[in-house]
Regions:
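Long, low-complexity, charge-biased intrinsically disordered regions
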Residues: 1-317
């Protein structure tokens, strides 16, 4: 679809996965029949960003992980809306310096559970054009591992890092990030596992985060400067941590505005507008309802299930 730009984006994505040792090739001779049957194909998604550049993302089919992970393991904590709003209010009231940050490729910086700890190996099957890209990147490592299945070239790899698409990926990253933060003195809030505080220069530094999106605040901007350096030292080896300073921050779909002293304004107009623009079903003028709960919602017996496309739209929006 995206031509040479798409290929370049795919190469860049696979290259950075290889640099981070996200997977290792597995000989078909060393695999059990069960491992081979459970291996799912890797998918490469290409999307066009706002700046017209193409972003590639290799995604793992999450179905195999459902079988050996508990419900608790696949449910990653999420910052409460109240926590986001209350910490923003405290930042404004105390006149704190605020910094928002985004850690690149967070999931793949977290290691998968080791097979010798009672967990099964997670095997991924790479097929099609992705095989050619892997061989181009490292022919000596991946070339001998190619096998043919139904006329297709296939490479099996053992997944070593939490790749996007895995149900456990967000939780593995959370556990790693939490451990790192506790190592530098942060104490986590007992009511919200995505909020943490520590004392620095006789004042509180507060961080709140949702996966890899972080907001840090402290009275002294130098504390945030040092925290930014620490984030890059720990998680920016293969791509710098992006940060935003100043009075206005685009964070978790909200525009957080501290321009008025002692006040904070939360604006989600842009987020709602983008959501409406991206919504695939277009309504005609006047085709509205005051409520989705019509008078017939509980009548008429068993209704027909909506089709797959509409179900996915409902889940997304």
């Amino acid at each position: 679809v995206f031509g040479s730009k798409g290929k370049e984006a795919a190469i860049q994505e696979i290259s950075q996965l290889c640099k981070r040792d996200c997977f290792a090739p597995v000989s078909i001779k060393d695999m059990t029949r069960k491992e081979r049957s459970k291996a799912k194909e890797a998918l490469m998604f290409l999307t066009e960003k706002k700046d017209r550049s193409i972003k590639g993302r290799m995604v793992y089919n999450s179905k195999p992980t459902r079988e050996w992970l508990s419900r608790e393991d696949v449910a990653s904590p999420t910052a409460a809306t109240e926590s986001v709003l209350l910490t923003a209010a405290i930042d404004a009231m105390e006149g704190r310096d605020v910094m928002t940050s985004d850690i690149p490729n967070a999931f793949i910086q977290a290691e998968m559970p080791q097979a010798d700890d009672g967990h099964e190996k997670v095997i991924m099957k790479i097929t099609g054009p992705l095989v050619e890209l892997l061989i181009d990147i490292n022919p000596h490592l991946y070339g001998p591992m190619v096998v043919f299945e139904k006329g297709r070239r296939v490479i099996y790899v053992w997944v070593l890092k939490a790749i996007y698409g895995m149900l456990i990926a967000a939780l593995l990253w959370y556990k790693k990030f939490k451990l790192k933060l506790e190592g530098v003195g942060f104490q986590f809030n007992p009511y919200d596992p995505y909020v943490a505080n520590r004392m620095v220069k006789n004042n509180i530094q507060t961080i709140i985060f949702h996966v890899d999106d972080i907001k840090s605040s402290h009275l002294d901007e130098k504390v945030n400067n040092e925290f930014e350096k620490w984030l890059n030292m720990e998680f920016g080896k293969h791509g710098s941590v992006t940060t935003r300073r100043g009075k206005v921050h685009d964070y978790l779909g909200m525009i957080i505005d501290y321009n008025n002293e002692g006040e904070v304004k939360i604006d989600m107009t842009k987020y709602v507008g983008d959501m409406l623009q991206d919504f695939p079903i277009k309504f005609k003028e006047g085709q509205v309802a005051t409520s989705p709960a019509s008078k017939k919602i509980f009548t008429g017996g068993v209704r027909k299930l909506i089709d797959k496309t509409r179900r996915e739209t409902f889940d997304t929006f």
